[in-house]
């Protein structure tokens, strides 16, 4: 299956747009940008899925998780809310499994390195 076929399988229009932005960055060799936008896609897509679960299926746990993290975002809480969000959807509603969670943790580390590069004096 080629990439275009895979892109068509992305259900949410907003998520598809985020993915296409990330993929475009990758195709143009803007790798740091691709990583940052891919991380943004992951977090936004989780919110979109939680909204869908809550609004369409009246999933109260999804609603609780949404409310909790929306409040944290509005408070501009410097805690690691993004990773906490992923851990919560993994443990409470099993939207992702433990292997995917570890991959997302790694992606977050890459995102931080891409968005906030470390400059050493000797290099």
Language-model regions, residue ranges each:
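Charge-enriched, short contiguous segments at helix-coil
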Residues: 93-123
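Charged alpha-helical initiation segments
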Residues: 1-37
